[in-house]
Swiss-Prot record:
It comes from Drosophila willistoni (Fruit fly). The keyword Signal does not apply. Plays a central role in 2-thiolation of mcm(5)S(2)U at tRNA wobble positions of cytosolic tRNA(Lys), tRNA(Glu) and tRNA(Gln). Also essential during biosynthesis of the molybdenum cofactor. Acts by mediating the C-terminal thiocarboxylation of sulfur carriers URM1 and MOCS2A. Its N-terminus first activates URM1 and MOCS2A as acyl-adenylates (-COAMP), then the persulfide sulfur on the catalytic cysteine is transferred to URM1 and MOCS2A to form thiocarboxylation (-COSH) of their C-terminus. The lineage of its organism: Eukaryota, Metazoa, Ecdysozoa, Arthropoda, Hexapoda. It is an enzyme of class 2 (transferase). This is Adenylyltransferase and sulfurtransferase MOCS3.
Length: 457
């Protein structure tokens, strides 16, 4: 009989095989649809589909709705100022969604459902379980699949007539021009500052509206950049990037899935208004702020174009894409990147801790938040000491007795091994004669190297 680990491996293999087969079927079905469309249009290359490089070829403009279109979109066709012409504009439009996460999934879902003719999906990442509470296009069966492919499967089940191209890569200064130039509207559904500056500059250069959304914890924001004569770009509002230590993504700060659903849906709404026209005032020069704790929306006016903006002024300094990771001093992904703040003798490998120190007398401080500490603890001896209490020195009184013993080793841990280094730095400044070390890689490393059954989040 197979052991537990072998059974888990076989389960993972079967899930991946099923996901690969579904992806292959999806691609074959789309290829069949494209061939049928080409035959219906008399053959040739005027089908408006993506070429090998991912660019959308300009092709035949659709001038009438099919019976299926009328049945499918009837509820929006009867809207004032929408009608047949509005639906045709959607049918002939192309939209690029950057990031198939909590914002990109609802945005893509509503744009595909509304009848946008061509969707481009960009994401470098794969589906994992931590996505499901907010990234509603992905499923358990598609764990490990590229997010773009997973989203395409779901979107084509929703609307088989939508043409979709997957860019399963990280957008950067080298590929952005080739990808973005052929789309009508771009949605920023990313989760990092470097990508926001990249998309902004590219949209200014190629004269594309940029529908920008963000969500963190219980709050969300939405605006449209680079739209209209006086509509500002992202650099008009934020000419200088924030310091890296001031930036928090949803992986670190958390987010409620329903909040991303609200903002992503509103991104789809603004995109439809831009494409159709006449449906109301586009959210350019204004920012919508959503507070999920109160359910309140605020609509505030933001500054107009900055006359000396480096990107969108009459004499811009930025006429080509630059190295945005260098410019922002941070990575262009929402993945956690390990800090290196401590010397090697101030750090401890999780395996070494498990083998040599775990059973010995020591203080084990867990500097995660109280909410995170409630999720899981490394041991019953772990003491929750949130990082904020370390930085404001309030822990000194709380642990005055324990800290008097210089011979008692102090081990500090966190989720991924970054906050623990910050805490150790601060504590060693206070107690230079104490043995204070952090656990390299935190709880994630513990799961990888010591106990694969320990919960990871």
């Amino acid at each position: 009989m197979l052991g537990v680990e072998a059974l888990r491996n076989e389960r993972s293999r079967l899930r991946q095989e099923i996901a690969d087969l579904r992806s292959a079927i999806c691609k074959k079905e789309q290829s069949l649809r494209e061939l049928e469309e080409a035959l219906a249009n008399g053959g040739g290359n005027g089908d408006g589909l993506a070429d090998e490089g991912g660019e959308r070829n300009t092709g035949t403009i659709q001038t009438q709705l099919t019976n299926d279109d009328i049945a499918r979109y009837s509820r929006q066709l009867i809207l004032p100022n929408f009608g047949v012409q509005g639906q045709l504009r959607l049918k002939n439009s192309s939209v690029l969604i950057v990031g198939m996460g909590g914002l990109g999934c609802p945005a893509a879902q509503y744009l595909a459902a509304a009848g946008v003719g061509y969707l481009g999906l960009i994401d470098y990442d794969q589906v994992e379980r931590s996505n499901f509470h907010r990234q509603t296009l992905h499923t358990e069966a598609r764990c490990g699949m590229a997010k773009t492919e997973s989203a395409r499967i779901a979107l084509l089940e929703l609307n088989p007539s939508c043409r979709i191209h997957c860019h399963s890569e990280l957008i950067n200064s080298h590929n952005a021009s080739n990808i973005m130039r052929s789309y009508d509207v771009v949605l920023d559904c990313s989760d990092n500052v470097a990508t926001r500056y990249l998309l902004n500059d590219a949209c200014v250069i190629f004269r594309k509206p940029l529908v920008s959304g963000s969500a963190l914890k219980m709050d969300g924001q939405l605006t449209v950049y680079n739209y209209g004569a006086q509509g500002p770009c992202y650099r008009c509002i934020y000419p200088v990037p924030p310091p890296p230590e001031a930036v928090t993504n949803c992986g670190d700060g958390g987010v409620l899935g329903a909040v991303t659903g609200v903002i992503g849906s509103l991104q789809a709404l603004e995109t439809i208004k831009i494409i159709v026209g006449g449906l109301g005032e586009v959210l350019a020069g204004r920012m919508l702020i959503f507070d999920g704790t109160t359910g309140q929306f605020r609509n505030i006016r933001i500054r107009s174009k900055r006359s000396n903006c480096h990107a969108c002024s009459s004499q811009p300094l930025i006429t080509d894409l630059i190295d945005y990771e260098l410019f922002c001093g941070m990575h262009a992904t929402d993945k956690d990147h390990p800090l290196q703040l401590l010397e090697s003798d101030q750090r401890l490998d999780v395996q070494t801790y498990h083998d040599k120190l775990e059973s010995q007398p020591h203080l084990l401080f867990d500097v995660r938040s109280t909410a995170e500490f409630e999720i899981c603890q490394l041991s019953t001896n772990a003491i929750n000491l949130p990082l904020a209490e370390v930085l404001d020195d309030s822990y000194l009184k709380r642990f005055a007795v324990e800290l008097q013993n210089k011979d008692l080793p102090i081990i500090v841990l966190c989720r991924r091994g970054n906050d623990s280094q910050i805490a150790v730095q601060h504590m060693r400044n206070r107690f230079p004669d104490h043995s204070i070390r952090d656990l390299i890689g935190g709880l994630h490393a513990w799961t990888r190297k010591v106990d694969p059954d320990f919960p990871i989040y």
